[in-house]
């Protein structure tokens, strides 16, 4: 996911409301009769960034669009504000957000004066962006401050495209092995196994009993829904009466491109979709196994 190189397949750019506040970043009262110099060091941008890919994990929701745990990347942050009866706007680019730039400079505070540095901070899904902008104000000690006020704050973020149940075509990728679920013929049934081809597509459905995984690449007409056999192998069945077709996904809706999930069978309740080196195929549903799978939206 990278906004610098254009929007990658499976992702989209959306605009969301975010929280921005003005804070007193630095305050100094010079009660002497001569000017005082002070060195100030600030960090502009995101602090404590640990992601080399710039992909962040939301620690709290962003409106109704992003839920806790969702992955996203910040493209821009824009804040409009008022100060001293004037309205202004400040923008921070992707580079400025992620570079976490340290700035040090010296200020001079006149005698019997108070220096206040206002800093504009923004919170985007738990990512704390400091010193988007700053305003320096010098007033007499005890004088009235002109406190800046945020009018509107929004961010453009990159997120995985939403997976619409019953509609969006996806690939299902094993998170550790980096191979895709494919469909082969075994015992005159379509069966799931891992492979490197990206041509195999699936659609997720949900009803009151759980999720179903439908293949769009069956070689036996009508045999489309993944279920666990009693021995654990994954085959594709017809109709909707088989309770072994139902799965639980460990993530709340909406699902998005790039989500990492597990599939637990609703019939064999302690068994999960996993890799197993079987005699002919290697996608199984086994007891106490909860392998992780990556959902990838297929480009329309």
UniProtKB/Swiss-Prot annotation:
Keywords: Antibiotic, Antimicrobial, Cytolysis, Disulfide bond, Hemolysis, Ion transport, Membrane, Secreted, Target cell membrane, Target membrane, Toxin, Transmembrane, Transport
UniProt protein name: Lysenin-related protein 2
Gene Ontology biological process terms from the UniProt entry: defense response to bacterium; killing of cells of another organism; monoatomic ion transport
GO CC term (a single one): membrane
Site positions per UniProt: Important for activity: 211
The UniProt record lists the keyword Transport: yes
Gene Ontology molecular functions: toxin activity
Superkingdom in the source lineage: Eukaryota
Residue span of region Beta-hairpin domain: 36-109
